[in-house]
Amino acid sequence: VSNYQDITNITCPDKKTVVIKLSKENVAFADYMTIGILPKHLLKGKKLATAEFNQKPVGAGPYKLISWDEGQSITLEKFDGYYAGKPHIKKIIFKIVEDSDARLLQLKSGDLDMAQIEPKQAKSLKKDSKDFDIYRMNTADYRAIAYNYAGSKLFKTYPELANILSYGIDREAIIKSALLGEGQVAYSPIQKNKFNSSDIEKFAYNPDKMEQLLQQDGWTKNKKGIYEKNGTELKFTITAMANDKVRVDMAKLCAEQLKAHGISVKAEARKELDWEKQDATIIGWGSPFDADDHTYK
């Protein structure tokens, strides 16, 4: 709702024109308007999360929903009335296959015509078969460690650790190992965005600097070789969703790198994440759009 507080007046001079007046300039407003408009006559007085409208959505795109088998598949059929012309593909079935190994098997068996696979799988597929075309997609997608500043006692007490620990993560090594080189070192959530600035601290890999900053902040190594401060060991767990093997690999690599420098870190693959209590997790996001609306709002 806060996105639209600048609106002072809305008029419709004709059936195909809407004029919106704002109280002040807002460069992000054009992106705010990309959010779909909900039909009041279908949703008034109903719970948005459970309304039938959400199970039978109607849009303005080239395809229309035919069926939805929850947790299994979504079937779309071409919409002949699409304003840009009839689609060439008559029907599209999106199969929901969370496990990457299962996706690869279904791709090989012919149950799937197309699938998003992991770099290690792409390498084996390219080696074993000439029946597949592999496409590389340039995206704004990134991975990062998200620290829990509210629910984790360690990071709630010492939030400055997030920046300090960044110097102990060798992102080049992670790209080579977990992604087989299919990626680049990230330093910002809007790195692939037109609003990005490269003139910021990039936290380049420098474990010596990390340890120096820890010591300046009052952390000292105990008899076990683990940094501690005020009786608290620098000890935490990095989680990742078990069905995302790339994130699990990344969590393990981050843990190994930090453990080599006196930080007790454990990596865990979990079926479900406890967002309120966990210390840290490997997240994925992408922000090619207006940063004010998409990342920081």
List the model feature ranges, each with a label.
Residues 157-255:
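Append "and occasionally in soluble cytosolic enzymes with long acidic Gly/Pro-rich linkers
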Residues 1, 19, 106, 155:
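Aromatic- and charge-enriched surface segment that lines or borders ligand/interaction sites
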Residues 18-20, 61-64, 74-75, 90-96, ...:
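Short, well-ordered beta-strand elements
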Residues 2-43:
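Surface-exposed binding/hinge segments that line
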Residues 272-297:
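Acidic-aromatic pocket-rim loops
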Residues 15, 34-87, 91, 207-212:
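Gly/Pro-rich hinge or "lid" segments in bacterial periplasmic/extracellular proteins
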Residues 101-111, 127-129, 252-261, 271-281:
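Short helices/loops that flank or line small-molecule/ion binding pockets
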Residues 54, 79-125, 255, 264-266:
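Ligand-site clamp/hinge motif
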